[in-house]
Structure formats: structure tokens, C-alpha cells
Amino acid sequence: MMILKLFLRSHLSLDGTNGMLEPWLESKGLGEADQVLAYFAVSKLGEPPIDGKTDTNPEGLTAAYGKWATAVAARLHAGGLSCKVLDKEAFQKQMLEKLIWISAFMLVGARHPGATVGVVEKEYRSEVCSLIVELASAAAAEKGLTFEEAMDERLCAYSRAVAHFPTAVKEFKWRNGWFYSLTEKALAEGKPDPCPLHTAWLKELQVV
């Protein structure tokens, strides 16, 4: 599975990463660019793509936003893949949920060497759910939005769909780094750390 973001302006360009791209997009004058959040994967060359469907979201998780969203969705549907067309706020919330997923599951997994995403979901669920709640609260406060209830259930369901994935804290700038930047900003302003558990575990692993 992956996050894939398509940026359409006067022409189609492509960029992809498992992480927070909003600051980078804004720095390039692309804050309003059309985007696609893709949840599908190809196991190997020639294999059909595997759609990102879970037991809590059987309709699929892939989503598109912007002027060309309907056209992108139609092309994905033609290829047998799901795709929802969302407004900007709904898309942003789904993007942030995926960021929370990868930041939380990778960090908890790294605390337990050898743990896959599936092992984290089964054996360390209380740890990862505590972190999900903390990161969701920080993200909601920063962006001024409200997430739908039961995020932990949705993210655990996604983890069951990609249970074989290994865990590691990497691409820090794009993933956990965004949440750590909220910590740094709060502390610089003399405010409490909005992500104390996240910060403690990053320090435990000597990431920061």
C-alpha cells in the first residue's frame, strides 16, 4: 500500500510519499493543487493491483480531491479500483488519518524489534491506540478540524489489511517529524507538549 498524490495544474505531474506534503506543496505555490490519496499496491510486475479495502471501509479508502477528481476516479474505476471524490476538508481529514497511521504504527513497531504492522495491531494495540488518540488530538487542534469517531478502529482495520508490512521510523521529516514540529512549536511558546508520548518514544529510540 502507499500514499500517492497527484498534482494537476496546467498539466499532470506526479509525486508520492507516505507523509505530510502540505508544507512542501504550499512552499511551491501548490496549496490548492488537485490531489489523490491512493491506497493500492502491485505485488510484482504484471500482477493486478490490490485495492485498499478494509473490514471497516469495504468501499475502499482511495480518494481524490479537486477539479480533476471525478476524471481520476473514473479512470481508477475503469481499472477495477475504488476511488471516492471528496471535498477539501474531508480529503484533508483522510490524509491526516493516514499520516497518523504510519506515524503511530511505525513508532510503536520500532519499540518492539521485528514487529510487523499486524503484530503491532494484535499484541501492542493499547500502545498504538494511545498514540493514535494523542496524535489525532494534536492534528485536530493544529488544523482546526474534528475527526470522525472510532479512528483507532479504522486504522487498526487498515493494519490488518497490510499486516505483513515491516515497521521502522523513517522518512522522519515527512512523517513523525510533522508531529514533532508541533511539539517544538508548543514548547517554544511555553505551552505543554501536545504529543508527550510521541516525544518520549522518539527519545527512547534516539530519533530526536
Regions found by a protein language model. Name each.
Residues 1-50:
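Rossmann-like NAD(P)(H) cofactor-binding subdomain of soluble oxidoreductases
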Residues 5, 90-101, 189-196:
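Short, surface-exposed loop and linker segments with low hydrophobicity and enrichment for Pro/Ser/Thr
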Residues 23-28, 46-54, 120-122, 136-143:
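Low-complexity, flexible helical/coil segments
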Residues 38-77:
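Short beta-strand and adjoining strand-loop segment in the mid-core
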Residues 45-60, 112-121, 159-167:
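Helix-loop-beta segment of a Rossmann-like dinucleotide-binding subdomain
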Residues 65-95, 101, 105:
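ATP/pyrophosphate-binding catalytic subdomain of soluble kinases
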Residues 70, 74-77, 81, 126-208:
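NAD(P)-dependent Rossmann-like dehydrogenase/reductase catalytic/cofactor-binding core
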Residues 90-134:
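Active-site-proximal catalytic alpha-helix in oxidoreductases
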